[in-house]
Amino acid sequence: TQIMSEGVEVTETQQTVDKKGVKDEMAHQLAKKLKQIAKDCNKAILTQSDKIAGDKTTPRQMGGIPYWITTNVLANGGSTRDFTTKLLGDAQEAAYAYSNGEADTVLLSPAQKRRVNAWTNGATKYMDEGATKLASKISVYESEFGIVKFVVERDLADSVVYLIDPSLWKSAYLRPFAKHPLPKIADKLQEVVVGEWTLEARAEYANAAIKDLKLATLS
């Protein structure tokens, strides 16, 4: 598991004054911190390649997608190459036997999405999504293994793309995120938002990672 927290501090004056559009300064600041925690959680899922048990001096750290996907890793020995339809097909084929074709979501950086737009000649379709995460638009592409959705993630490195089955991943909470009051210091009111959670990978072999990618110059 991993503990994440954000603290808030406001003065009694700030809390008492009814500012335009903000009747409760503490609640307003806590809402902003919750948004930041959501971003931090998403970044941890996408980028944390190590799982750390932790000790008195080192905090615990959960493993993210890079830590969990170990079976279907399409690397190139450190030599970079373009992200192509063939590489995507190879990743789909690698995961297909385990996922029954349910690995249908591609996570990639904004720059790699531009690469996708290039090899689809700008013909990428768009689907309406009832709920979006971090304002990422979702596009689709049909290959011989079926339709995949592309989800742009700003925290992903340009050198890696993930093909996942979202149903096989879950955020599990030992302690759900909640606010807790802290002792008052003089005129300052304090609260903290804290939670403890981890990422569960129910079948990492039904997903794939494409590594050692580069960005070719787009014309």
Cite the ranges covered by each PLM segment.
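Flexible, glycine/threonine- and acidic-rich loop/arm segments that mediate assembly and lattice contacts
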Residues: 1-219
